[in-house]
Swiss-Prot record:
Class of the enzyme per the UniProt entry, highest EC level: ligase
Principal location listed in the UniProt entry: cytoplasm
Protein name (Swiss-Prot/TrEMBL): Glycine--tRNA ligase beta subunit
EC number: 6.1.1.14
One Pfam family per UniProt: DALR_1
Record organism: Haemophilus influenzae (strain ATCC 51907 / DSM 11121 / KW20 / Rd)
GO biological process assignments: arginyl-tRNA aminoacylation; glycyl-tRNA aminoacylation
UniProtKB keywords: Aminoacyl-tRNA synthetase, ATP-binding, Cytoplasm, Ligase, Nucleotide-binding, Protein biosynthesis
MF GO annotations: arginine-tRNA ligase activity; ATP binding; glycine-tRNA ligase activity
UniProt subcellular location: Cytoplasm
InterPro entries with a match to the protein in the record: DALR_anticod-bd, Gly-tRNA-synth_bsu, Gly-tRNA-synth_heterodimer
The keyword Protein biosynthesis is assigned to this record: yes
């Protein structure tokens, strides 16, 4: 079998940097899927992505599609011919679909009789004849939310397409993709190298593009180069570069030929809280800040240029000139904000609407203050500090700094509170109230901050659900899913003794008559318990384990978590499958029992197997009660796992629905007690 390397490059206008990597990997995945569907073998697929191009290279692609045998079974012979032996319409229709006559069909004998069958060999095509459609289909399936048209073309893509190159070895694959004919022309860097050049062979890519076009097409190569050179620059300046993965990938997507440079800003700007300066450098300018070994911001930053002049002075000075006004603004806002205390900004919160039916930010602040105090009492935090932090929680939204640099909310509140002489725990809580901000983010460190963070999240959840605006589909304008998961993480990971139902009731009471949803408490609790499912699935915990616990609807998150861990452990035990099946059987029996079931009467036991099970469940009921009270569900289920033998023996030797009513009721009581033991932890009958 002969093979060749295949190259496809799509040359475009500048692609959206935050979408570039996803587009490239999806393109490669789609090409792979199309090749597999066509039955074409290959060794490996490589993807390339730069601001003005997407490319895929398939290594050792078979140049010929293999032939394949197909079988199409038709009707049974008994149904294919009438009494006179003539083909029926069903047989003729099937044969016509196969491109044959009924007489040309073969017959196959099965244990269900004889059937008509058509066997045919489909000859494989040369790979070059298939590639145009394969590429077109792969591009059509890219995740492009808002495709665009350009010029007078009717085709759509994420950005205008200027060049298409498809090569199988040294052979140009002719065809048209997105309205552009395939050619050997490849565009180089916009400012460096050759603007256009020809490529003769797929093997020349991406090396030729780097040599002639000054473009590093390999995304991961550019990324590694930027990272290494940035770290080296920072080390040379006596610091460490702050290089977040998301920003690194965005910068990688912005340049074709990275040139890593360092620049500086005036030291007097360091009097401004570092978070505001970093927000400007990272968010607006895509710079990497530099910190010293103690974590203090240095007056230097690293940036990545897309051009590489012999003397970079002009580029460095240009970037310093660009960032200076932004830092000057931050400095001005900070100094201006310090002239008014946070607490004095409270009245202005009355001018900002939180939600039309739920009132202003001042109303929300008042509710957070009260709820934070209640939560603080329950978790052993300082109530006065929690209420003070709740009162000040939204005041920094009224500052110039946060108005201009919105992502600094919370952290600027902390700095301003420190300047105002507020307690340190109160100040820190103003920042940590928004934690966790995203999946995997750190949690509030102090209990005071945890109380405020929970109060804020529960106020939003209760309020929005209370006016009937629960999230629908992917729409979640108030980020309720994030709020719910954040609240659960705080309660579970800090093992706080809080109950969801109690918190929602307390939160709802603070809204007065503003809430219209009479089922708000149940709705919020169910919504939050539902978020557990996504959380645990991400951890690799089986869905049936989560469902087993959800069936009991425990509303204390820390308790819910303990049950999930216990059931997940129980599921690994040898006796788990048998006991789960037995519990299903017990559930079915009890569901049909109808009348109320009393207590076990040991003296009424007749069979040895029923007496053994009765004694075992009664003994365990007493033994596990203190463990249930302690929340030690793992030990409880370990002990209940020992019931497998007596349960199996019971079902093997005892007829539950005995004719004697007293005997039947006692046996139902045994099963009811057995089920009750497990239900104190979870409904294990749902385990698969």
């Amino acid at each position: 079998m002969t093979t060749q390397n295949f190259l496809v490059e799509i040359g475009t206008e500048e692609l959206p940097p935050k979408a570039l990597k996803t587009l490239a990997t999806s393109f490669a995945d789609n090409v792979e899927a199309e090749l597999n569907q066509a039955g074409l073998s290959f060794d490996k697929i490589e993807w390339f992505a730069a601001p003005r191009r997407l490319a895929v290279k398939v290594l050792n692609l078979a140049t010929q599609q293999p032939s394949k045998e197909i079988e199409k079974r038709g009707p049974a012979v008994s149904a294919a011919f009438d009494a006179e032996g003539k083909p029926t319409k069903a047989a003729e229709g099937w044969a016509r679909g196969c491109g044959i006559t009924v007489e040309q069909a073969e017959r196959i004998a099965t244990d269900k009789g004889e059937w008509l069958i058509h066997r045919a060999k489909i000859e494989g095509q040369p790979t070059k004849n298939l590639l145009n459609d394969i590429v077109a289909n792969a591009l059509a399936k890219l995740p492009i939310p808002k495709p665009m048209r350009w010029a007078d073309k009717t085709v759509q893509f994420i950005r205008p397409v200027h060049t298409v190159t498809m090569l199988l070895g040294d052979e140009l694959i002719e065809g048209e993709i997105l309205g552009v004919a395939s050619a050997r022309t490849i565009r180089g860097h916009r400012f460096l190298g050759e603007k256009e050049f020809y490529i003769q062979h797929a093997d020349q890519y991406p090396q030729l593009l780097r040599e002639k076009g000054s473009v590093v097409a390999d995304f991961n190569e550019r990324k590694a180069e930027i990272l290494a050179k940035s770290q080296a620059k920072a080390t040379a300046l006596g610091g460490v570069a702050d290089i977040e993965e998301s920003l690194l990938e965005e910068v990688t997507s912005l340049v074709e030929y990275p040139n890593v440079l360092a620049a500086k800003f005036e030291e007097h700007f360091l009097a401004v809280p570092a978070e505001a300066l970093v927000y400007t450098m990272k968010g607006d300018q895509k710079y990497f800040p530099i910190y010293d070994k103690d974590g203090k911001l240095l007056p230097h930053f690293i940036f990545v240029s897309n051009i590489n002049p012999e003397d970079p002075t002009a580029i460095i000075e240009g970037n310093e000139k660009v960032v200076r006004p932004r830092l000057t603004d931050a400095e001005f806002f900070f100094k201006t904000d310090l002239k008014q205390k946070l607490v004095d900004r409270l009245p202005r919160l009355e001018t900002v609407l939180f939600q039309q039916q739920l009132g202003t930010l001042k109303d929300k602040t008042d509710r957070i203050e009260q709820l934070a105090g209640e939560i603080a009492k329950q978790i052993g935090a300082d109530e006065a500090k929690a209420k003070r932090a709740g009162l000040l929680s939204k005041c920094d939204l009224m500052t110039n700094m946060v108005f201009e640099f919105t992502d600094t909310q919370g952290v600027m509140g902390m700095h301003y509170a420190r300047h105002d002489g507020e307690d340190e725990e109160v100040a820190v809580a103003l920042n940590e109230q928004y934690m966790p901000r995203f999946a995997g983010d750190e949690l509030p460190k102090s209990l005071v901050a945890s109380a405020v963070a929970l109060a804020d999240k529960f106020d939003t959840l209760t309020g929005i659900f209370g006016i009937g605006q629960a999230p629908k589909g992917s729409a979640d304008p108030f980020a309720l899913r994030r709020a719910a998961l954040g609240a659960l993480r705080i309660i579970v990971e800090k093992n706080l003794p809080l109950d969801l139902e109690d918190l929602v009731k307390k939160s709802a009471a603070l809204f007065g008559d503003k809430l219209t949803n009479q089922n708000v408490v149940a709705d919020v609790v169910d919504f939050m318990l539902g978020r557990f499912r996504a959380w645990y699935q991400d951890e690799g915990i089986a869905v049936d384990v989560i469902q087993a616990v959800l069936a009991r609807r425990p509303t204390r998150p820390a308790d819910f978590d303990a049950r999930v861990r216990a059931v997940s452990h129980f599921r690994t035990l040898d006796s788990a499958e048998a006991l789960a099946a037995a519990n299903k059987r017990v559930s079915n029996i009890l569901a049909k029992a109808g009348a109320a079931i009393g207590e076990i009467n040991l003296t009424a036991c007749v069979e040895p197997a029923e007496k053994a099970l009765a004694e075992a469940v009664l003994a365990l009921r007493t033994e596990v009660q203190p463990l249930i009270a302690q929340g030690d569900y793992t030990t409880v289920l370990d002990k209940l796992a020992n019931l497998r033998a007596p349960v199996d023996s019971f079902f093997d030797n005892v007829m539950v629905n005995a004719e004697d009513p007293a005997l039947r009721q006692n046996r139902l009581a045994i099963l009811n007690t057995l089920q009750g033991l497990f239900l104190q932890v979870a409904d294990i009958s749902v385990l698969q």
